[in-house]
Regions:
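Conserved glycine-rich cofactor-binding loop
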Residues: 10-11
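Rossmann-fold cofactor-recognition segment
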Residues: 47-63
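Conserved mid-core segment of classical short-chain dehydrogenase/reductases
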Residues: 85-101, 144
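Residue(s) in the substrate-gating loop at a strand-loop-helix junction
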Residues: 135
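Active-site loop-to-helix junction immediately N-terminal to the catalytic Tyr of the SDR YXXXK motif
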Residues: 141-149
Length: 154
């Protein structure tokens, strides 16, 4: 069966998405900055769904690693779900631009970077699907977290 790559696999919604794809027979690549934290989930999915689950280290904010990361996936995934996200406190972002930049890089720029690589490959092969999971904060902007919200809306 085909593989589905889930980026940001530690989020609660990503974990449930992983379970659903596994129930439907898809093997999984679960990618996260701390993939070791996903061992219990991977073992549970393997037992319940009898599929392969491969844990992959991946930091969406490290753009220079994206090509090597995607090239390391064999076989290539049929589908990709991006659920990565980062939210610093609004005041932290206002007082420390590195927090703002990390928010934007994780929530928007990183997704664009990795998905450009993946979508080009899928287009070349005329096969595949991509799902982006964002946040209601991107739709319902609030002044209390406008940096996070705008990064999710982008």
């Amino acid at each position: 069966m085909s593989y589905v790559l889930i980026i940001g696999a530690k989020s609660d919604i990503a974990k449930e998405v992983a379970r659903e794809y596994a129930k439907n027979g898809y093997n999984l690549y679960l990618a996260s900055r701390q993939s070791e934290d996903l061992k219990d989930l991977a073992n549970d999915i393997k037992i319940r769904s009898n599929v392969e689950v491969v844990l992959k280290e991946f930091d969406i904010a490290k753009f220079e690693t994206h090509s090597d990361f995607y090239n390391s996936l064999e076989p290539k995934p049929l589908g990709v779900i991006v659920a990565a996200g980062y939210m610093a406190e609004q005041k932290e972002c206002e007082n420390d631009f590195t927090k703002t930049l990390n928010t934007i890089n994780v929530n928007f720029t990183g997704a664009v970077s990795i998905l450009n690589i993946i979508s080009n490959d899928m287009e070349k092969n005329k096969n595949g699907f991509i799902v982006g999971i964002s946040s209601v904060a991107g739709d319902r902007g609030r002044k209390a977290n406008y940096i996070y919200g705008s990064s999710k809306a982008a």
